[in-house]
Amino acid sequence: MATKETLLEELTWRGLLYQRTEGLGAHLAAKTVTAYCGFDPTAASLHIGNLVPTMLLVHVARAGHKAIALVGGGTAMIGDPSGKSEERPLASADEITANAERIHAQLSRLFAAANTSGVTLSNNADWLLKVGAVDFMRDVGKHFSVNYMLAKDSVQSRIETGISYTEFSYLLLQAYDYLQLYKKYGCTLQVGGSDQWGNITAGMELVRRSAGGEAHVLTAPLITTASGKKFGKTEAGAVWLDEEMTSPYQFYQFWINTEDADVGRYLRMFTFLSRAEIEALEAEHATAPHERSAQRRLAEEVTSFIHGTDVAGVAGEVSGVVFDKRRDPAGITDPIYKAIMTWIPGAAYPGAHELDVLALLEDAF
């Protein structure tokens, strides 16, 4: 586990550090720092892409710093243009509120599962829905020139196709978040994905210009697979953390299907295993890649983190039933039968003891 002095070294080794502001290392080593990361509630659940900033916050908290997970109940009313080729439809206020509550609960469970202390959960709707337009333009807008905003990648990429004032002004709202958290919690570090660099640095500038405070930024890389595909996307779509949207079996299978060239990197990024444990798994995998021991451990660790150890064990058992056709059906327990019928498409059978595993495999695959 990293300390305040070794946090950046730990994040670098784990592949979680892409960009950072000058002087951040000394800032982290000198005192207890409060860091925050935003989570967008435009969907009813977090997805596995959100695990990267989540892991960043967990490592920050475990190193002895404080962390804030900020649900964007206010900014989601506007929509972030970063990485979008066209305007997003605006979700209703009721939908965003419901999503924010679900994501708040998910984040609470994740930080508890990671055994972290010093993590605060907040929602920017608490201040963004209360600030007046004139006050916002005077207190925030005056610190940013139009030229500065036009130079941001999220705006530049939309100049030709068009961008509404709503999305154009998004970075000011996110910058205001940083200022509010600086004033309320003494927050001096924002973390996020590298695609958020423009928005995050705007917040850093606002803290410095408006409050005269020290503020820093740290981003993680956007992840692609060794074959060049975007991480977290499957033919069925996103891989969600909510078991009603992506079953624990499907979640487990996503990780166990990791390419050989990616498994070591994912073990470092998405698990809390030590350097020695991961290096041992990599050595074992290099000797016998067909055994897929590293992939199995990756699937077990991440599924346990998201869904709990018991559910992860069942997901592993179901995976074994589905892919090991030599397995004797008589040895399969009732909980595994029940999970198969719940999680496997087409596995609708009259009773657990009447289940024909070979028929199941034919139906499902």
Regions found by a protein language model. Name each.
Residues 1-196, 200-204, 211-216, 229, ...:
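NTP-dependent nucleotidyl-transfer catalytic core
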